[in-house]
Amino acid sequence: MNIIDQVKQTLVEEIAASINKAGLADEIPDIKIEVPKDTKNGDYATNIAMVLTKIAKRNPREIAQAIVDNLDTEKAHVKQIDIAGPGFINFYLDNQYLTAIIPEAIEKGDQFGHVNESKGQNVLLEYVSANPTGDLHIGHARNAAVGDALANILTAAGYNVTREYYINDAGNQITNLARSIETRFFEALGDNSYSMPEDGYNGKDIIEIGKDLAEKHPEIKDYSEEARLKEFRKLGVEYEMAKLKNDLAEFNTHFDNWFSETSLYEKCEILEVLAKMKELGYTYEADGATWLRTTDFKDDKDRVLIKNDGTYTYFLPDIAYHFDKVKRGNDILIDLFGADHHGYINRLKASLETFGVDSNRLEIQIMQMVRLMENGKEVKMSKRTGNAITLREIMDEVGVDAARYFLTMRSPDSHFDFDMELAKEQSQDNPVYYAQYAHARICSILKQAKEQGIEVTAANDFTTITNEKAIELLKKVADFEPTIESAAEHRSAHRITNYIQDLASHFHKFYNAEKVLTDDIEKTKAHVAMIEAVRITLKNALAMVGVSAPESM
């Protein structure tokens, strides 16, 4: 339990003891503690006096006064109490309790903020999963940044997280990739008789693959068409996936599993789920096609599994894949989908229900569109290539840290304008620079302290920490673990970037209000330990969203 929860629990216990002592109720109702919107109204407030009105048959302000009169303020860490309005009780805490967070942060280091107990739940988090047919773009970048941050947050909150990338290496798009490579392969050999398929891939990378294969494996030209296309499928996917993996690794995004769609066919899992759905009576034949009764589970219409030409729709292997996720022992399935996949939510949930799996175990987040902005105008095409701007170009333009930070600053269900000019600015207007500068500034102060012979663990008396800005800063440090818990519960990576901005802001305010290194050696020791706790918190929070914490800038 974190220090904030401990204090709130103690306050609730002492209020309950006070109610008993005052004889206000035989059975005490639920005591709710809230943080007032206006800090002038205290650190915490409760409406328990009004809740007790009917039970105690007294005026709520009288009840509030009785609670106050019988409260053990020392145990509750309370230095002042006000009764406001019809009977709200506002508590102002003795903030020395907050200083306990300083040695805790220093002792835990990289683990500070992480919960100690496992949730005992396995989470499979699938994100990015871009088709291996071209470069990653800004939409994939947002998916990668949010997905990786969410995996870090859930892990810190005590979940057992598996990060997974689903490789769409089967289906029409891979056939089109193979046909496109075939055309470029023969062109490189001087044979222009092979035309590009209607839905082919015309990117520069396909030309390069064709040339490379023509140089290294010219013998492929003598293969049968079937064998040739099989080879181009395999080599094309390998080439594209190697490039995607390299870009994602540079973007500080890593996966535990790379799950191949082809493996579902090789292990006959698609046939298995199809047979199971038929056995359960959820499929039917109509218009020469095989349908799934998803309307039985709140979908707006039934869905085709097998088309009238005998080929599978994309939906059927998707069902097999998600059923495989369940079979692997995962309690929670989280998918991060692009904005064009909104219609998939109900049908995927319905498909799980056909197997008796609670569809609430599947959570789907839709990543809304990102616009790249420069000088107030949208940038759609790369000036260098004339094509859509790739993740690699974004990394080259603004850097990994800025890209990761900016792409996790907003809720994924909201559209976002990525200001590339702002992301490159070395000023406090740039959110990531502002946060990293706070960390670098702390490192600079700690270096000066060390030169004066003051170590971060030297303090054992924190009573000298009385400055209002210092207290507010410590409150923010103490709020780190609850913020992680909240971000995990709501699957909201942007709660961490919001927290980082607040923490950096509180540090800068403290720094501008009071000197850290002073002639008062005991006060200096306390301040040095405090800012080390802030530094650890800031570094851990930045790491959670995949951003570095530089020691100098």
From Swiss-Prot:
- CDD domains reported for this sequence: ArgRS_core (cd00671)
Q: Which reaction does it catalyse?
A: tRNA(Arg) + L-arginine + ATP = L-arginyl-tRNA(Arg) + AMP + diphosphate
- Which keywords does the record carry? Aminoacyl-tRNA synthetase, ATP-binding, Cytoplasm, Ligase, Nucleotide-binding, Protein biosynthesis
* GO-annotated biological processes: arginyl-tRNA aminoacylation
EC assignment: the record states 6.1.1.19
Q: What are the record's GO terms for cellular component?
A: cytoplasm
Provide the GO MF annotations for this entry: arginine-tRNA ligase activity; ATP binding
**Which superkingdom does the taxonomy of this entry point to?**
Bacteria
One Pfam match, given by its short name, reads tRNA-synt_1d
Subcellular location field: Cytoplasm
Q: SUPFAM superfamilies, alphabetically? A: Anticodon-binding domain of a subclass of class I aminoacyl-tRNA synthetases, Arginyl-tRNA synthetase (ArgRS), N-terminal 'additional' domain, Nucleotidylyl transferase
Please name the PROSITE patterns in this protein's record: AA_TRNA_LIGASE_I
Recorded protein name is: Arginine--tRNA ligase
Species for this entry: Staphylococcus aureus (strain MSSA476)
Give the encoding gene's name: argS
